[in-house]
């Protein structure tokens, strides 16, 4: 029994003494931040949807399924298999573009001021963290030769004066797309982080 306890102690010491690299630390922070953003996006969408009438929900969901998100112009993996085959740098680059595409629209989300005030700084912090990870992983490659190409057009006529029905549709679309994109970024960063552990199973 004493020998077994001693062996377990040695093994535990060996595991706990494994150094955590700066890259792993940055990835952990980035994954945690986008996870929190994804949860916030889910909550905001659920709260908005629950405030609608049943028929309104049905019609908006039908319209959204036929529509597309502004960020769909950003080329990204089409399924989990392509995601797993993508390089760490590619996943980071797509994540950066997705986060940046929300910096402006997020300021006009039709949510309470407390929630809206949380979103912008969280996006900015996450964008900075991803940029640091890109710098650490690009090995001299230039991922963003023209920063102007990263700026996407605003979401249609969302910033114009809208009628009641159109405004409702735009709010639904923005919140649904925000939730969708935060889920994408969380998936990409989680897979990229997993690549740092060769023994880990990164299957989605």
Swiss-Prot record:
Q: Where in the cell is it found?
A: Secreted
Which superkingdom heads the taxonomic lineage of this protein's source?
A: Eukaryota
The record's listing under Pfam families reads: Hormone_1
Where are the disulfide bridges? 69-177, 194-202
Which SUPFAM superfamilies does the annotation name? 4-helical cytokines
Query: Which keywords appear in this protein's UniProt record, sorted alphabetically?
Result: Disulfide bond, Hormone, Metal-binding, Pyrrolidone carboxylic acid, Secreted, Signal, Zinc
Where is this chain primarily localised? secreted
Specify which residues bind Zn(2+) according to the UniProt entry for this protein. Answer: 35, 186
Q: Name one GO biological process term.
A: growth hormone receptor signaling pathway
Entry annotated with the keyword Lipoprotein:
no
By sequence similarity, the record places it as follows: Belongs to the somatotropin/prolactin family.
Q: What does this protein do?
A: Growth hormone plays an important role in growth control and is involved in the regulation of several anabolic processes. Implicated as an osmoregulatory substance important for seawater adaptation.
**Protein name per Swiss-Prot or TrEMBL:** Somatotropin
Q: Which organism is it from?
A: Morone saxatilis
Lineage of the organism: Eukaryota, Metazoa, Chordata, Craniata, Vertebrata
